[in-house]
């Protein structure tokens, strides 16, 4: 799938993450800013990438600003950003529940 527009989800508050997705033509690029990047950076990137793979999104630039978000928050923010970027308003919860657990 291809993103139709730039989309953002999340906040800059403590224990949250702001995910911004921008369409590109060069593949997946994840730019991460996090105070815990040395400890958890690879795990954060892997979670973001796994959500994008579920939606079959390959050409996207991800700008992620982490403020100590838990795994479930990272996944949720990425899902919301994808739906916004695709211009979808109806969430397919049954499908999401199959692969998010």
UniProtKB/Swiss-Prot annotation:
<comment type="function">
    <text>Covalent carrier of the coenzyme of citrate lyase.</text>
</comment>
<dbReference type="Pfam" id="PF06857">
    <property type="entry name" value="ACP"/>
</dbReference>
<protein>
    <recommendedName>
        <fullName>Citrate lyase acyl carrier protein</fullName>
    </recommendedName>
</protein>
<keyword id="KW-0963">Cytoplasm</keyword>
<dbReference type="InterPro" id="IPR006495">
    <property type="entry name" value="CitD"/>
</dbReference>
<feature type="modified residue" description="O-(phosphoribosyl dephospho-coenzyme A)serine">
    <location>
        <position position="14"/>
    </location>
</feature>
<comment type="subunit">
    <text>Oligomer with a subunit composition of (alpha,beta,gamma)6.</text>
</comment>
<dbReference type="InterPro" id="IPR023439">
    <property type="entry name" value="Mal_deCO2ase/Cit_lyase_ACP"/>
</dbReference>
<comment type="similarity">
    <text>Belongs to the CitD family.</text>
</comment>
<keyword id="KW-0597">Phosphoprotein</keyword>
<dbReference type="GO" id="GO:0005737">
    <property type="term" value="C:cytoplasm"/>
</dbReference>
